Amino acid sequence: MHTTLTHYARCVFGDEYRTTPPCDRQHDEALFIEQLTFADADAILAMLRELCPTLVDGYLPVRIRNLSYRLVLLQKPNEPALMREAAASLYAQGPDWDDIAAELERRADALDAAA
């Protein structure tokens, strides 16, 4: 059984650092995305940090990482450190999202300046 979002992600996508435990549940990406969509920010961050500890590693697909950070920032919109972490992840995946990453950094800087 998938006891956490991290465990579910590990079953669906694998884990670069740990063996994927045996599991008799269905491993459909669409069902995982449904769970991810309604997960709380802390569960999503725990998954990202355990499965991709240095942002550029791990087996989570880029589309799942991007969606995960987007969902976290929707739940925690005023946290500059999370904005910068999301920006770093976007920069690490190539130039396609550099403009979005730069905007996240600008927003983080503005929040810091206002504090």
Identify the role of each PLM range.
Residues H2-P21:
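N-terminal "cap/leader" segments of large eukaryotic alpha-helical scaffolds
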Residues H27-F38, P61-Q75, D98-D109:
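Structural detector for internal amphipathic alpha-helices that build alpha-solenoid repeat scaffolds
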Residues C11-E16, M47-T54, E85-Q93:
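Alpha-solenoid HEAT/Armadillo-like helical repeat scaffolds in large eukaryotic proteins
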Residues L5-A9, F32, I44, A86, ...:
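Generic structural signal of hydrophobic/aromatic residues within well-ordered alpha-helices
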Residues M1-T4, D109-A115:
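Short intrinsically disordered terminal tails
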Residues Y17-P22, T54-L60, L73-K76, P80, ...:
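Charged, low-complexity interaction regions
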Residues H2-T6, R25, T37-L48, P53, ...:
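Alpha-helix initiation and capping sites
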